[in-house]
Amino acid sequence: MQWNVPRTVSRLARRTCLEPHNAGLFGRCQNVKGPLLLYNAESKAVLVQGSQKQWLHLSAAQCVAKERRPLDAHPPQPGVLRHKQGKQHVSFRRVFSSNATAQGTPEKKEEPDPLQDKSISLYQRFKKTFRQYGKVLIPVHLITSGVWFGTFYYAALKGVNVVPFLELIGLPDSVVSILKNSQSGNALTAYALFKIATPARYTVTLGGTSVTVKYLRSHGYMSTPPPVKEYLQDRMEETKELITEKMEETKDRLTEKLQETKEKVSFKKKVE
């Protein structure tokens, strides 16, 4: 007596469907015709042959019905199924990571004008203003510094005694003693006051630079600087245009050389 494997599998499937109370979970029953490809979560496949209607009970498995195919058709291998699932998982991870990266990188904020930015210290404002408006700040700073030093020197000439003031501020005794016993007197006193008034001098310089910049812009001597974002976009467009022109020139040259080569080859063939 020969053992018919397909018939035995069909009987087991029919018995499982007819006795649902023995199963812990109800699955899906499908009425299928033709060959049936049954595979579970572990990618094990069983091919059931049969032309009659069969009810199958599926709890933790997936059922795929296919039409009859030639005898040389084979079911997909478990390795292929696992490879496809791995590809889908990797692609999902890539998309998720790219979205997280795009959300985690906020756009860079445009830097405010250092003349109007009050959130930074006086020294930082002075440095940024020097970088952006150096041509305006240097003359203004030289003029204001000359006025400051001249004022202090004039006060020293008039006999203004600044030593008590320096002691009140809390300067070291070594500096105060130098000013007391100095022979040059007026110049050194003016220089000491000049250095002490550095915060006030920087503030006056920034104010004078701001007024000068507004005046120059209102009369058309200085253009208003565009925002950083627009400036970068303009630069990128200019660079793109230059690259496109160079590529077109190179393409034209190559086309001409190819045409010349073809003409030479055709001429040689005609001569031969």
Swiss-Prot record:
Q: How does it sit in the membrane?
A: Single-pass membrane protein
Localisation per UniProt entry: Membrane; Mitochondrion; Cytoplasm
Q: Where is this region: Disordered?
A: 246-272
**TM stretches of this protein:** 136-156
Question: Where does the DUF1279 domain start and stop, copy by copy?
Answer: 117-229
Q: Which UniProt keywords apply?
A: Coiled coil, Cytoplasm, Membrane, Mitochondrion, Transmembrane, Transmembrane helix
Coiled-coil positions: 229-271
InterPro entries attached to this UniProt entry: FAM210A/B-like, FAM210A/B-like_dom
Q: Where is the signal peptide, in residue numbers?
A: none
Identify the GO cellular component terms for this protein.
Answer: cytoplasm; membrane; mitochondrion
Q: Which Pfam families match?
A: FAM210A-B_dom
Q: Which family does it belong to?
A: Belongs to the FAM210 family.
Q: How does it assemble?
A: Interacts with ATAD3A.
The protein's job, in short, is:
May play a role in the structure and strength of both muscle and bone.
- Name-wise, this protein is Protein FAM210A
Q: What is the originating organism of this protein?
A: Pongo abelii
